């Protein structure tokens, strides 16, 4: 009943992916320790001879379905907004109707009977006028006015798009780290199995006074560090009884010409700056002296209710104009030229900072390329060394140092661990470059070549 109760309590619980093993052993037997070594050597020989070769995890930098949906919806809304605003401008033909009605109270109280004066006086006046405000219409600078609408919406669209794509870099870095962590974690798990057996052996030797505390403490510390790393890297993944995964070493070649061209012309930041400059140039065209005047041809019809209770009518045509006695437009254009210089200087500063940070990352990638190649060569040579030593150990009639042999296998695993971490750091450096220069989809700037 107790066993059934215990099973019922544990049923349905998710098993832990990793549990620390025993650190301190008691009552160790020499035969048991040697048997553990031999079993582990046989297991390692099989794993090393038959690894699972995998390609280096790919940096899947790109927009997911939700990104595409959000961007497409935003683009569609801005295009619709621009179209409606252009239609509104096209309706602005400059025609305007004005009218006025007013009375003259003095006409009711004046007793003068002069007929001539009676004709010139009126009690009320009604006036209607059709004018054509041509300068403030689509017919004057219509192209520039439509461009102003389009550029303002394009600037807003690009700025929103930049915010919509800002999260893909962290997401991509997390996904890449997760992939590498699995491979790194499995290597550390195999190293930990070696350290467990070495720890067991050192404690047996300590009991027999054959070793100092220093070596045992080092192995115990290495074991604790490995357990900590696994708990961080693979806390929610099962890495027990996994094969040895061999990631094919690669070298990353960066097309710096295409990279800097993207920074200068194709990135979202560059397009935003170019749009701001186009807005300033277009605004400079709109700012001229004529645009501050009003020139309105008109036709007017007037009806008078005269003091003698008769009605008279008359029509006239003319041109009404308003001309300012000052001209502020040269100063406005000068201000716009200054604004363009501010935009260019700001962009120049941004590009300078981007180039500095990117050059540091490019140097880091090159250094990591060299370190990865060195580790790959070291792994290759260590593997050959282990193969040669395997036959030597088998033919050793007087026995051999089991701990030394285990350290050789552990050294190979540690070299794999270092190389995988170097490749991860290189991938993260690439993502940081892509973030700095606003690359948000897969491109041909970074090419990965197998060594």
Which role fits each region the language model picked out?
Residues 100-108, 131-133, 198, 300-304, ...:
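Outer-membrane beta-barrel pore domains and translocons
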Residues 46, 68-148, 161-165, 169, ...:
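A glycine-/polar-enriched beta->alpha junction
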Residues 37, 145, 149-231, 370-441:
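Charged, solvent-exposed structural "stalk/scaffold" segments
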Residues 24-27, 47-98, 213, 238-299, ...:
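Amphipathic alpha-helical coiled-coil scaffold segments and their short linker/junction regions
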Residues 342-381, 388, 392:
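C-terminal structural cap/anchor segments
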Residues 6-22, 26-68, 236, 251-260, ...:
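Acidic, low-complexity, intrinsically disordered peripheral segments
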């Amino acid at each position: 009943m107790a066993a059934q109760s215990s099973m019922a309590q544990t049923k349905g619980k998710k098993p832990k992916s990793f549990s620390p093993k025993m650190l301190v052993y008691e009552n160790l037997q020499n035969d048991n320790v040697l048997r553990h070594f031999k079993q582990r050597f046989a297991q390692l020989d099989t794993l090393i001879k038959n690894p699972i070769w995998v390609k280096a995890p790919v940096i899947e930098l790109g927009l997911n379905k939700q990104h595409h949906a959000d961007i497409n919806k935003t683009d569609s809304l801005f295009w619709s907004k621009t179209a409606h605003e252009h239609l509104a401008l096209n309706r602005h033909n400059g025609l305007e109707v004005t009218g006025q009605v007013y009375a003259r109270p003095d006409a009711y109280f004046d007793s003068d009977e002069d007929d001539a004066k009676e004709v010139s006086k009126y009690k009320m006046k009604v006036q209607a006028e059709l004018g054509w405000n041509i300068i403030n219409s689509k017919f004057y600078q219509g192209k520039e006015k439509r461009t102003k609408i389009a550029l303002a919406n394009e600037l807003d669209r690009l700025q929103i798009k930049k915010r919509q794509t800002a999260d893909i870099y962290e997401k991509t870095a997390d996904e890449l780290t997760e992939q590498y962590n699995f491979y790194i974690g499995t290597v550390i798990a195999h190293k930990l199995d070696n350290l467990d057996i070495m720890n067991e052996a050192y404690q047996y030797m300590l009991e027999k006074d054959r070793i100092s505390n220093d070596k045992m403490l080092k192995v115990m510390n290495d074991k604790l560090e490995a357990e900590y790393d696994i708990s961080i890297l693979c806390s929610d993944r099962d890495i027990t009884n996994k094969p040895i995964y061999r990631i094919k070493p690669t070298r990353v070649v960066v097309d710096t010409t295409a990279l800097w061209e993207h920074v200068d012309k194709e990135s979202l930041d560059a397009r935003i700056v170019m749009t701001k400059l186009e807005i300033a140039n277009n605004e400079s065209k709109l700012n001229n002296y004529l645009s501050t005047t009003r020139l309105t041809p008109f036709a007017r019809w007037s009806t008078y209710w005269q003091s003698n209770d008769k009605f008279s009518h008359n029509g006239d045509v003319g041109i009404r104009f308003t001309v300012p006695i000052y001209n502020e437009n040269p100063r406005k254009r000068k201000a716009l030229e200054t604004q363009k210089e501010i935009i260019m200087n700001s962009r120049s500063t941004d590009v300078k900072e981007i180039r500095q940070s990117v050059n540091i990352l490019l140097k880091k990638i090159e250094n990591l390329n060299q370190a990865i190649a060195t580790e790959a060569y070291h792994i290759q040579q260590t593997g050959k060394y282990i193969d040669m030593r395997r036959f030597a150990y088998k033919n050793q009639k007087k026995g051999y140092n089991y701990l030394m042999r285990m350290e050789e296998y552990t050294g190979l695993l540690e070299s794999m661990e270092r190389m995988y971490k170097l490749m991860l750091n290189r991938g993260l450096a690439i993502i940081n470059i892509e973030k700095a220069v606003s690359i948000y989809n897969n491109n041909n700037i970074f090419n990965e070549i197998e060594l």
